[in-house]
């Protein structure tokens, strides 16, 4: 699983209310949430981000209240992956559950500037700053998490597993 795109870089302690303000929590429609992603932080974010781009942030990204709306908004606006120095644990789980790839790597965050072209290999745990010709090592995604990402999130992964189990049960006669 390799992702490549332009970096959009922000700072520490970006909370879920900054990612998707509470005034938009009356919907769970990804397209609607995407329109308002990070708007209180960067009014032009949704106009600047292109499909496949990578969000880069400091420590404690996704802190604050637990809302799946935050990673849904990020994924729906076209971001392919988030690299941060650290993630709030509940955001980390929510991101995995909805199929948004996330990577913790302090060195990469320090070595990437806004606008840099970045490539992330989740399987190998390699982050490349193609603009500056630098490479950083992160912890590779475990295989079970890669499978969740490939399926598009935990719900789709479980549906696929249940279908396999049902198929196996039907064919074991």
Swiss-Prot record:
Name the source's superkingdom. Bacteria
- Please provide the record's keywords in A-Z order: Amino-acid biosynthesis, Branched-chain amino acid biosynthesis, Leucine biosynthesis, Lyase
Enzyme Commission (EC) number: 4.2.1.33
Residues forming coiled coils: none
TM ranges: none
Instruction: Fetch the SUPFAM superfamilies from UniProt.
Output: LeuD/IlvD-like
How far does the signal peptide extend, from start to end residue? none
Instruction: Kindly state which reaction or reactions the protein catalyses.
Output: (2R,3S)-3-isopropylmalate = (2S)-2-isopropylmalate
GO MF terms listed in the record are: 3-isopropylmalate dehydratase activity
What Pfam family does this protein match (any one)?
Aconitase_C
Q: Which GO terms describe its biological process?
A: L-leucine biosynthetic process
CDD domains (alphabetical): IPMI_Swivel
Name the pathway: Amino-acid biosynthesis; L-leucine biosynthesis; L-leucine from 3-methyl-2-oxobutanoate: step 2/4
Q: How does it assemble?
A: Heterodimer of LeuC and LeuD.
What is the recorded function of this protein according to its Swiss-Prot or TrEMBL entry? Catalyzes the isomerization between 2-isopropylmalate and 3-isopropylmalate, via the formation of 2-isopropylmaleate.
Question: Can you tell me which family this protein belongs to?
Answer: Belongs to the LeuD family. LeuD type 2 subfamily.
The name under which this protein is listed is: 3-isopropylmalate dehydratase small subunit
According to its UniProt entry, this protein's organism is Caldicellulosiruptor saccharolyticus (strain ATCC 43494 / DSM 8903 / Tp8T 6331)
Gene (UniProt): leuD
């Amino acid at each position: 699983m390799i992702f490549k795109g332009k970096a959009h870089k922000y700072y520490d302690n970006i909370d879920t209310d900054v990612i998707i303000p509470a005034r938009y929590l009356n919907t769970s429609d990804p397209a609607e949430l995407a329109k308002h992603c990070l708007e209180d932080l960067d009014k032009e974010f949704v106009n600047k981000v292109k499909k496949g781009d990578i969000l880069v942030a400091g420590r404690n990204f996704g802190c604050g209240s637990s809302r799946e709306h935050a990673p849904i908004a990020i994924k729906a606006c076209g971001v392919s992956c988030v690299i941060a120095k650290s993630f709030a644990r509940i955001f980390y789980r929510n991101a995995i559950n909805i199929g948004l790839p996330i990577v913790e790597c302090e060195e990469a965050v320090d070595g990437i500037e806004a606008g840099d072209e970045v490539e992330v290999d989740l399987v190998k745990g390699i982050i490349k700053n193609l603009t500056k010709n630098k490479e950083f090592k992160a912890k590779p995604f475990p295989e079970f998490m890669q499978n969740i990402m490939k399926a598009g999130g935990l719900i789709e992964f479980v549906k696929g597993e249940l279908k396999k189990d049902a198929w196996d049960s039907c064919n074991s006669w």
